[in-house]
Every structure is written in structure tokens, then in C-alpha cells.
Amino acid sequence: MSYSYAEKKRIRKEFGVLPHILDVPYLLSIQTESYKKFLTADAAKGRLHSGLEIVLKQSFPVESKNGQYELHYVDYQIGEPTFDETECQVRGATYDAPLNVKLRLVVYNKDALPNEKIVEDIREEYVYMGDIPLMTTNGTFIINGTERVVVSQLHRSPGVFFSKDDSEEGAFSARIIPYRGSWLDFEFDSKGIIWARIDRKRKFCATVILKALGYTQEQILENFSETKTITFNSKGFALRLDNLSNMKGELLKFDIVDAQDNVIVKKNKKLTSRDVKKIKDAGVDSVAIDFDLVSTLRVAKDIVNEATGEVIAYANDDVTESLLESCVEVGMLELEVIDFITTERGRYISDTLKYDLTRNTDEALVEIYKVLRPGDPPAAASVKALFEGLFFIESRYSLSDIGRMKLNARLGSDKVSKDIYTLENSDIVGVIEELINIRDGKGKVDDIDHLGNRRVRSVGEMVENQFRIGLYRVEKGIRESMSLVHKDKLMPKDIVNSKPITAAIKEFFTSGALSQFMDQDNPLSEVTHKRRISALGPGGLSRDRAGFEVRDVHATHYGRLCPIETPEGPNIGLINSLASYARVNDYGFLEAPYRKVVDGKVTDEIEYLSAIDEDNYVIAQASTKLDENNHFVEDLIQCRSGGEAIFTESSRVQYMDVSAKQMVSAAAALIPFLEHDDANRVLMGANMQRQAVPTLKSEKPLVGTGMEKIVARDSGNCIIARNAGEVAEVDSNRIVIKVDTEKSQTSNLVDIYSLTKFKRSNKNTCINQRPIVNVGDKVEAGDILADGFATDFGELSLGHNLMVAFMPWNGYNFEDSILLSERIVKDDKYTSIHIEEFTCVARDTKLGPEEITADIPNVSESSLAKLDESGIVHIGANVEAGDILVAKITPKAEQQLTPEERLLRAIFNEKASNVADSSLRMPSGTSGTVINVQVFENDKGGKSKRALKIEKELIDKARKDFDEEFAVIESVVKSSIEQEVVGAKIQKAKGLKKGAILTKEFLATLPFSKWLEISFEDEKLEEKVQNAREYYEEAKIAIDAKFEAKKKSITQSNELSPGVLKTVKVFVAIKKRIQPGDKMAGRHGNKGVVSRVLPVEDMPYMEDGTPVDVCLNPLGIPSRMNIGQILEAHLGLASYGLGKKIEKTLEKTRKAAELRKTLEEVYNSVGDKKVNLEALNDEEILTLCDNLKGGVPIATPVFDGAKEEDIKSLLKIGGFATNGQMKLFDGRTGKPFDRHVTVGYMYMLKLDHLVDDKMHARSTGSYSLVTQQPLGGKAQFGGQRFGEMEVWALQAYGAAYTLREMLTVKSDDIAGRSKMYKNIVDGKLTMNVDVPESFNVLRNEVRALGIDMDFDYSSEEE
């Protein structure tokens, strides 16, 4: 087994028995693939069936009303973005690119005859059609400077669905849902009548739709019912027994007798195959029935007197005595009737036709028009156009390829081609037929929560739909423009207005429910946000009306949606996460991978199955035992089939799971020993990992699952090598790799990677990248070069490993509280950096422009000490609460001065200050260091000194960066040429003869530019040098061009909002140490609040004097049933012991051979998966050992983790008791505790619920307008609510004075609180109480009821 660069530095020992069959697919592919499909920028691959191309093709050509102009679509191009991703974030711009569409305007001769079209002119040009937001490499969008994610939506798939309303007997319904257009419903009522609805409007008879489609009453009955023939004569009535086989399973309503009056089959019996044979053998072809039965029948076809042409009865008329008499009169002794006798099937349509008052197609169309447009007069043309537009015109109704596929599959017919996306007559007839079958018990209703009936709509598809909406508006505009514009040489640009497209797309990205502000607490929260699948949003469910069924875990979720990770609260079950191996197919259905089983042998061939396909197979679990030939060991195997868990013979198995973790999401797969935790707690654990704050120093988990590196790699926060090569240069800002051209398919000789330094994330955490490679290291493509935030050697590291003791300690861990050691604070283990952005905007006001300046009236020098001459804070300044960050003045209206004030001003020579101080100050409760300042100005007033200074710094930095980049390229080209040419024969060189040998010394005397002028006799060598020469020249041109582009973007004017003159952004880094009140958690849903930070010397300690870091309450485990944390602690302790073992070996010797023995014991004595230490050289073994001193990292994959025996064996090797318990001593007294305590290493996270962000205090502040009570909450700088129950408490103690001030001066007694403030200033310690404002509100409310109520002050005066 080969190891990557980062893995060699620290190999994770892996438990788990199952073989590795399939790599976890790229975690962000659901986002990137979907949007790539939408843009389909690569025309060579054929932009045909999706995205922009199809929308544009469907919308064009557009024809003018008079037919003179036609606008055709030809092609489109997506331009280059103005700014790159980082620049857009800095400037608050959107990362997008212009869409230019090539349109062809065809002009026809207006004098030509109406039926012929003579082309007069064709004009073609590219037309700007708005800006399309581009997706960043990590699957996000930058909209107005902020990173956003478009969450995929799980919605009901287009197609037909049959369901049953349990509240009513026989209330079955069918609903045809298109991708775009009107919904069509058919439903049974309790009487067996079939009703139809369009778009959930008023219901009408289903037969109205059939008549509107052109069917006659007779044709409708023929389609939906069986017919029987009745013969009648003087003896009575007889029913012909045709198609006996069709009657099988039906209940007989009469006895069947033979010629001798023997009963062959009795009445009220279900007919069987044996009965049918008996009847046929007896030669019975008809059976006598009485008139009572005949009178329940109806005529199947119109009965016409052939002699006169008179209609005796219409189809569906009841059979009556008079009708029979009329038939006898004209000599008809046979009557074709609808078969209600042997089946109920025909009665539903027949009864519906009885209710249906329309007689033909025209009346049916009018009836539908009245339902959809009540009040509108129905005109013949508009009536037909409305009905056709509903279901039969592709621009207004589309089932889409998914809907057509689902509809054909559900009706079990392929009569309609896959390419027809509108409804056909046969579809509607088929749906009604199937509905009748279901009512008759011959079909099944659909399970709406089955993932075969729900599909995922990803970002590309949503943007495509928005684009279609915008384009539809543009199309209407084009038609209007064609008829209004009178221009000799009309061009496409003149008639196309692209604003509706821009508006539709902008609206979707800025205010759409599924376009969300990216969760960026840590890399995991980014990844899970992008993999989220929501059932909410437009066209989805609403959380108020979603029931239990839709939220529940369904059998089809297996391997597709995670059954664990979902929010707690009102959205539970509506927002899900994609399972780790799941993918979305071309139709939008979720698929899971399986290994194919052929003739009882499990192959490594992988097949992806959708939920519909999976129902038909028997699938074995990933943990099923196999022999060395991949055959099943056991005869009876636990499998899944049709959504049920079954035991079955191994010969029946068709597929097998790929991995044990395929049913859970990426976040749940990060929890070790997940299988030993209760599902509710795992849900909390998976959700809380997303809230972990990245700390100053990242530390890998000692006990992981092996999923850490996958999440870190795919999150895009680490820097990954594009090509193999050697590290040429490293510093904190840049890594330079000299590319190995033999291994890499690239013409580049150098790869340069720029690192992100101290960037603010969406959640104000700090994004920072650190290189992990050294100069001279050899790296392969795909190796990690630099860690991002919350990663350690390319592994996700959300917290720290702490030594935990499960024991109570003086009540400080009561109710999930956490007792911490001071060592954690000293070592800055949970210290995190938060970057806050403060913005100051100078606007143009009515009274004049606001000004950012250091010259502010009535502000002391000390307050301005941290500002520069422009009035903006210096970078590096330490700022406290209340400090000025940006000094700004706002003009205020002139005020009239009293004579006294004018006199004073004259005496003290003070100028009238007509400006107010509106500076940006540091908010209360915060302090930190200014790390960056950005100034944005419009060009009108010229740039300020600070703006010019920042601009110059950026240009100088860019110049330096590009110069250094070029120097690196030059040195690489130089060394590669030198290696090739030294010792070669010269063709031509200044200072040397032809045929001379080139030496290193001679090259050293020449500048590099002259090297490139030397030519050689060897043609191959000459070609190589020529290639290097060309690469060097191209690189020089490219770097100059890049610098010019960068310079242009730095100096480019900023587009500020209207009325804004200048915007200043100040970034302050705030360091937050862990303190009491902060929330911490493990990975098993074991959360708590820090109650106390205890000095190290008071913490319980082990026999060797090592103090523990954390004391957790043992009572938090049994009831919560998250035993995984105990196993993690045991395995963590073993890992720590193994690290100590390696450290002791290192202290004795640094010989690789000895170290290999220790490593062999540590890695390969326990567990099935061995580590190949032979793949590492001696130097790498030493580095590995140095990195393992703190503990040997262990991976225990979910559902395939370490067993109890493995943990005991490792504890033994690590030198600990196999029960994981030990004697602890009290740090305060030095005495041992009574019982042994479970001690181990657990990975603990600090969550983004910090006490600093919640604690807040107020003396005076703002008040509510109506009640005049202080506002509530930190954001409003509100007060502490003293509620009803608190008042009762004071009443119970009789604390009258305290109560009075709580309800008056401290709350809403306006006069009293003003007086109180004055009294405090004057040194008077008295309190004047007035009527609280809430009483006045009450009085006014009572007055509103017409009762005059006032307060009686007389008793007070007396």
C-alpha cells in the first residue's frame, strides 16, 4: 500500500474488517455537476438536452404580430468575469459573467401575398442577455460579496399518482402532475361518481374532460365498460354468457342452471376456473334472469329505428318497460346493455354520465371554461384555446422526460412516444381506467414517500427555470418591440431588453428560499450545507402542514438519504442530508451503489440503482461474510427486498452493499462507535460537529473513522497539488512546486499556490491556510500541500483530545456541566480567532455630504490617537469598546442660539458647530486588533490619502508577487536547461567556436537572456531548449498580462449604491479563550456548559502525577444511551498509551530498526488491516515516530469498527488496565478517591455558542414606543425582563419598595425615570413615582370600548 505525503507523516491505524471496494465520491458533485450541466459551456460535447441551450431553443423563434419579422436563436457565449472570486468578496460584487446570445433577425417582404414568405434580409449579431452568476470551484456562489449556497430540493416527481383518502370509503384519486403547467385530478366520491378538477378548482364530472377531448357518450361507454346481450320473448329474459373467462373471480347474482334445471353454479358465489369448465361442458350459453335484474341495467349504444331513423333510446338510458315495449314494436328482440350483472366496473362511468349534463364537445368545453374563468363570457374561440393551452401546447404544459417516463411506466403502456411531453388522449383514458381498477381492488395506490416518487431538483435546474421565466418576459417584450419600432435597419439589439432575465436570476439568488447564506463555521458545515436536501421551498412542502409520514425515515432512504442527520425542531425530517455514496441520476432520482452478485459470487462490478429499480432485487448487507473466492459463507443471509428485512437463501441474492457507511451522511460517518449510540443522540452529535469553532491550533482526533481526510479534501479548504513535482519554495503566503513533467501531463514547469491568510468567514470565524511541506519534498498529484482552517495534516480537526475522567466533582458537573482544567486555557487549546467586519458609510444628505475626517468637534485627542490623518484607524491598533474606528461627521440644521449662548461663544471664541459626530465606534463588550481596512470611494471627489495608500500597497504587493513568481519560473527553467546542455556541442554561441563543449563555468559568465540565444548541434536537444525558450517567453508575457489585469482591477472605480460617497470596512480580530458559560460537546451528542476552570493543581490526578483535563458527569450516560463515548475514551486512552510507548523508545534510541519493531507491535499486532512499514524509509520512520508521541491516531469506521477484544488488547500494549479504569487522587487533599474511575481520551469540541456573544448588561437605553418599556435582547441593547412570576416572588416576600421601583422607575414611568436620573446626578437619594405608561395604555384600551376610566389621584392628595 502506498501512502500520500501527509499520511507518511502520521499513519492512522485502521480497524474494520470489510474490504475497500469503492472510494467515497466527490462530496460536492451534486452542486458542481448540476451547474456544469446548466451552463454546458463546452459546445463541442453538444449542448442539447439541458440547461441554457434547451431553454433558448424552446423560446425562439419569436414572430412579430404582422409576420414581417422573425427572431431566431443561433448560439450563445459566456464571457469572462470582471473580477475573480476574492476580488468580488472584497468589493461586495457578484461573481458573474456576461451571457451573449447570437440572434438572427429574418425580415420578410411585407408586400408579399399572405401565404408566401419572401426573405428580404437576414441580420445576425451577438446580443447581451444579462449576467449569469458563476459557481466557484467549491460549489458556492458569490452574490453581493457574500458566499451563498443553493440547497437542492426534494419535490414530488412529475407523473401520475394514485392515492386514497382514508376519511371516506372508496375515495380514491389520481393526480397528473406535470413539470410545468396545470394539475389534473380525478377522484371518486362515496357514491362511486368520478369527478375531475383542474388546478384544484371547483370539481366537475370526469366525463366532461373526455367529451372535451372529442369522445361521444357511446365511445366513452365503449372504452370503460363491458357489454352483455339480453334476449327477450314471451317466456322472459335471458342473458347471453359470452366471454366466460372474463367473469372469473366475479360474484354471481343468479343461479346458472343447465337444460334439465340442475343448478351448476349457485348464486352469490365467486366464479372459478372449474365453474367455467362445468358451464362450458354443460353447453350452457345463456341464463334466465328476472325483470328486477333487467331494470337495473342501462343501454350500451344508441337504439335507432332503422326504418324511420328515430332514436328510441340513447346510450346510458335506463332499461324500462316502455323501452322494451318500443323495441318489441320495431321487432328488436335483443338488447346490448352495460354489464352491471357480472362486474361493477362499468357502473362508475355510467353513473358519472348520468350526473354529466353536457351533451357534446362544445358544451363540455364551455363547462370547463366556466370552472376556470368564472364570470367571463365564453366565446367559442377562447373556450377551445383555453382547454388546448392547459394540457396540449408544449410552451405552456410539459411533463418533461421524467414525467413522460413515469406516466408510461405507471400505466404500463408505451403507446405514447418518450419525446412527447404534453398529454395525449390515451394518457387521460389510461389514468381513469387505472383509477377504476384500483377502486375495484385490481391495482395499488402509490406510496408518495417512496423515493421513486420524489426527485431532487438541484441548482442547475432551478436557475434554468428562473432563466425560462425571465426569457418568457423578454419574449413578450420582443413581440411588442417588433410592432412598435419603425426603423430602416432594425437589428436584434434594438428589440431585445435583457433586464427581465437579470431581474429573475437576481431575485432567485438574493431572496429565493433555497438560496441560503453559507454556513461556514468549519469545513464540515460547508460540506453538509452543500449536500443538504430540503423538502421545503417553492413547489415543495410547508413545515406547518407536513405530517409525520413525510418526515419519517422510509425504507428507500437506505443509501440515499441519511436517516440520522436532520435538524431538531419544526424542520425535522423535512431537511435531510445526502448519504455518503449517493448520487443523483439524469432524471433527478437518488441512486445508491451496489456490488453485483453473479451465480452466487460477489463481484467488484458496481451498479447504481434508483429506489424504483431496487424494489425488484434482493440485496445483502455489506457485513455479510464471504470466503476467499467471494462466495457467501452462510446459506441463510439477512437481506433487504422490497423495503423489508428478510432472511433468505444465498442463491437468491442479486446485489450486495458497497460499504457499511453507505447509509449515513458524511457528518454521521465522522462519529466513531456510532453503532453503540442511540439515534437521537447521534443526530445531536452530527449537528453539533457543524457548530464547532475552529481553534487557533488544530489537533487531529486520536479516535477517528477514516472519513476525516475525505471531508477535509473535498471541502476545498486545503491546498491540493495539481501535479507531481518537488517543492521549490515555501513561505506563509505561497508554495512553489517545480513540476515533474514526466509524471504530469502539463506544459507548466512551475505550479504556484497562493495561501489564504486571516480571511473572515460567513460566521466570523477565521480562515487561514498553513503550509505542511518543506523545500525539497517530493509530492504527487492530489497530495495535501497546506492545511486550511480546522484541518491538521489534511484531516478534519474540529476540536482537541482531552483526558476525561467520568466522576462527579463537588457538584461542578451537575446537569451536564463540564469542569475544565486551567491547563487547557494556558495552552490556548480552545482559543479561537473571530474576525468582525465593521462598516462605515458616508452619504450625501439633504443638508450636505457626510465627511470622514479626523477633525471632529468636542472629541479629545486621546480618542483620536489610533486614527490616521484621514480619520480611519491604523492597522495593528488594539481597540476597546467605545473606541472610534472611523471618524465621521454629519451636517445638522442651523440652530437658533439664545443671547446668553451667543455671548459665551463670543467670549470663548467658539465657532458654531453645525455638524454632529456620527463616528463608527467599537460596540460594547468587544475588543480586538485591527487587521485590515478597505476604503471604497466613487471617483467624483477624487481619492483620499488612505485609499491611495491602500491602492499603492496592493499594487506593490501584486508587483512583488508576480516578480517573485517570474523569478521562480526563471530559476526552474534555468536549472532544467543547465541539466540538459552542460557538456553538449555548440552550433552557435557568442564567445565560443562551433563544436565546442559547453561548460558550467561559461554559462555562469552569461546573463540568462543570453543562454536562450545559444543553439546546439543535437537536434533533439535543440528542440528541448527551444521548448524551454518558448515556455519562458510565454510565461513572461502571461505574468505581465496578469499584473496589468490585477492593477486594473485594483484601481478600477467602485460601484457604490446611489447616494453613497464612501464606504470604509474595518476588520477586527478578536481572540476568545474558553471560559465558564461556553458550550462544549463530544461527538456523541454529549453536550454541556463549562461551569468552572479549575487550577491544574486541584484537578484529580493519576498515580504518575498526570492531572486529568476534564471531569464529566457519569450520570449523563445511562439514560442517554450514548455508550460510544465510553468506547471512544477507552480507545483514546490506548492510543495515548501507544504514543507514550513510542516516546519511551525514542528516548532510548533513534535507530530506525528499533523503532520499526515498536511500530510493528503498535500497528500490526491487533486488527485485520496491517500497515506496510516497509514502504517508508528510515528518515520517514523517524518523522512518523516524532509525530506519534502524543498518541497513535486510530480509525474505527462506522458499523465496522474496533471490537471489545481489540480495545482490550491495545490497552494492554499501551500499559493500562484492560477495563480502562484507574485509581485517581484528589488534587486538593492528595488522597485517593474511593473507587476506580474510567479515564480516557475524548475528542471535545467548542461550539459556536460563546458566552461572550450572549452576556450583556444595560443601565439606560432605548424604549419601546407604545409601552415605553425597555426593549429586549442583546441586539436591541435591551433590559432584563421582570415578568409576572418574578413579580409574584417579590409579592410573596413583601418586598414592596423593590417591587415599586421594578414596576415604575426601572420600567415605564417616564417622568419618574427622568427625575431619578436627575436626582442621582444631584446626589439626592429620593425617588418620585408617577403612573407607569402601561396603565395609560390600559386606560386607552378601556376607553376604546366606550368606558371612560381615569385614575383617582384624590386619595393621594388627602
From Swiss-Prot:
Record-linked Gene3D superfamilies: 2.40.50.100, 2.40.50.150, 3.90.1100.10, DNA-directed RNA polymerase, beta subunit, external 1 domain, DNA-directed RNA polymerase, subunit 2, domain 6, RNA polymerase alpha subunit dimerisation domain, RNA polymerase Rpb2, domain 2
Keyword Transcription listed: yes
EC number: 2.7.7.6
Gene Ontology biological process terms from the UniProt entry: DNA-templated transcription
Assembly mode: The RNAP catalytic core consists of 2 alpha, 1 beta, 1 beta' and 1 omega subunit. When a sigma factor is associated with the core the holoenzyme is formed, which can initiate transcription.
UniProt family annotation: Belongs to the RNA polymerase beta chain family.
Matching PANTHER family: DNA-DIRECTED RNA POLYMERASE I SUBUNIT 2
Protein name, UniProt field: DNA-directed RNA polymerase subunit beta
